């Protein structure tokens, strides 16, 4: 699963390891460094969180070795593969929230996984850190991320959030289930989880999939397509590629 997610980065890293044994010195590209570090951090942090969030729930009665293995497995597959060794529907709310985050981040660029990609998440974190330090540019490892790439990353993340919100709203709108309002709160969470899972092309579900009607299934199919191709890719394909070099007078507004 890991090698399938980080194919391009491993393709860059393996020749460097080979050259190191031969006495040659080559450096990893910045992209490969960011992908490997971000992926490893997400897996480790996710596994630790799942372990402590579920040690009194689904991990009760299993050995420590098995519990650790389950935690790492679920942390890895939540961003790409969608396999499951536990019943997702009985996880704690905190674990569900964590899985939503991991599915939103998704896999690495160049893989068949969906989501906003781990490099986008890394750039967003670097942007926040550099701004807090007073840096105008986004710097990492003696390199500067181009401002155009930073702007594209922000656009991808915000467009993804908006699309997820719209699709979730559509699932609720087309719902034909009956019952008390309070009883539908659980269904609301299930729809959100289903939408995030489709966006990340993960395949995890809290069990609501068989109960979706035709219109809701169409929405999920659309979400999977958008998650795989990417919201900005679709936008660029839809609109004209002609650049408009129009600049108006600047005016500030209050924010925050």
Where does each model-flagged region fall?
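Glycine-rich, basic loop-to-helix element that forms the pyrophosphate-binding segment
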Residues: 1-3
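Membrane-proximal intracellular helices of multi-pass ion channels
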Residues: 5-256
